[in-house]
């Protein structure tokens, strides 16, 4: 049967040697059945077959069968050398087998070289790899050889490349975000729009494939995730700086969590930025732990996105969830108009920030008990309330009281003298 399959391969392969890309799946599927035997027996036969079957099998059928033998014998390197020596009787087999050796020795380069346009090589590589994956056959590499190598390379590299680009972009963006939140919000949104537009242009071609590939390639995305995590873990230095910057802004953060859901609205559609941004969103709840903790109950119950509030210690899970959210929002971005998302985002981001800053100023004022001090200030009209409002949250309240009393005394003799 194997000899018949070899003869079938030899005839078909020689006859269709140019169209092997179309024909080889048939004989390769024929090979699938005896492939476990092919690897074992054909290695033995090839020595005999090469002398006997060469006129029939010609370069092609020997080359896949012996490529199979070669893969089978890659573990047994002395094997292919005599077969190769026997195969050198045909220059074509030598060429094919040399190519197949170069292709087949590294399996990874095989899958890549299977992409090589000469279908003879690619299909031989596929048939050999199919025989190597005897269960899968050519169907494993042939459709996927074109698809995953094509699409996975796109899925692997395109997400990889924009991720890397965005990582490079985000490091300054995050610095800007943390230095100036509002302007960085615009700046980040603008760049994110550009990035998302560029990414959309990329994603229009295989949107579903990429979603599937992201979900399937989370393991390979673990590399870009690893890149992001490495950058994000390298960012804790920046985060420490950022936390120092956010330290005085923490009252803003205590009020800002209502702004957070709007920001993740930015961040979720903004596809690759978010994991870092979300972490930066997440760490602010952490610094309040260092600083006044009562803000944490404010931040957590308030409508922050649940991932940053809970997995503060679970940033890795956060990153995974965020990547999933990214993937979901990537499709949402594909489906929804970006403007419909971004405009409310840009609109929502700033109104919360607008009131938040005065609220953040007002909250410490009320906490500092400015109202009685204001009452005392209202007595001496000479004291301008507006500059003192800035001073109010400071512990200057007691000296302000004493100053107000002094002012009252000074005014009272002035009034009496006048």
From Swiss-Prot:
Biased composition annotated in UniProt, kind: Polar residues: 84-98, 358-370, 399-418
Annotated positions of the Asymmetric dimethylarginine modification: 342, 353, 391
PTM comment, free text: Phosphorylated.
GO terms for cellular component: histone methyltransferase complex; MLL3/4 complex; nucleus; protein-containing complex; transcription regulator complex
Predominant localisation class: nucleus
Biological process annotations from GO: brain development; DNA damage response; DNA-templated transcription initiation; heart development; labyrinthine layer blood vessel development; myeloid cell differentiation; ovarian follicle development; positive regulation of DNA-templated transcription
Stretch list, region CREBBP-binding region: 1-352
Compositionally skewed regions (Basic residues) per UniProt: 200-212
Bias (Pro residues) ranges: 282-310
Spans annotated as NCOA6IP-binding region: 60-214
Quaternary structure note: Monomer and homodimer. Interacts in vitro with the basal transcription factors GTF2A and TBP, suggesting an autonomous transactivation function. Interacts with NCOA1, CRSP3, RBM14, the histone acetyltransferase proteins EP300 and CREBBP, and with methyltransferase proteins NCOA6IP and PRMT2. Component of the MLL2/3 complex (also named ASCOM complex), at least composed of KMT2D/MLL2 or KMT2C/MLL3, ASH2L, RBBP5, WDR5, NCOA6, DPY30, KDM6A, PAXIP1/PTIP, PAGR1 and alpha- and beta-tubulin. Interacts with ZNF335; may enhance ligand-dependent transcriptional activation by nuclear hormone receptors.
Cited function: Nuclear receptor coactivator that directly binds nuclear receptors and stimulates the transcriptional activities in a hormone-dependent fashion. Coactivate expression in an agonist- and AF2-dependent manner. May coactivate expression via a remodeling of chromatin and its interaction with histone acetyltransferase proteins. Involved in the coactivation of different nuclear receptors, such as for steroids (GR and ERs), retinoids (RARs and RXRs), thyroid hormone (TRs), vitamin D3 (VDR) and prostanoids (PPARs).
Protein's name in the database: Nuclear receptor coactivator 6
Protein species of origin: Rattus norvegicus
Gene it is expressed from: Ncoa6
